[in-house]
Amino acid sequence: MSNVGTTGRIPLWIIGTLAGTLVIGLLAIFFYGSYVGLGSSL
């Protein structure tokens, strides 16, 4: 199971999944904060 087209030894789909999860999490926190009122100061 040697993936040649990967950056280092981490598969690209793992990087994509982690990046997508982080982006969705940040957007969720930002929108939640804006609804509560804490995000208005940002």
From Swiss-Prot:
SUPFAM superfamilies: Photosystem II reaction center protein J, PsbJ. It is a single-pass membrane protein. InterPro entries: PSII_PsbJ, PSII_PsbJ_sf. GO terms for biological process: photosynthesis. Coiled coil: none annotated. The chain crosses the membrane at residues 10-30. Its main location: plastid. Gene3D superfamilies: 6.10.250.2070. One of the components of the core complex of photosystem II (PSII). PSII is a light-driven water:plastoquinone oxidoreductase that uses light energy to abstract electrons from H(2)O, generating O(2) and a proton gradient subsequently used for ATP formation. It consists of a core antenna complex that captures photons, and an electron transfer chain that converts photonic excitation into a charge separation. This is Photosystem II reaction center protein J. It comes from Chaetosphaeridium globosum.
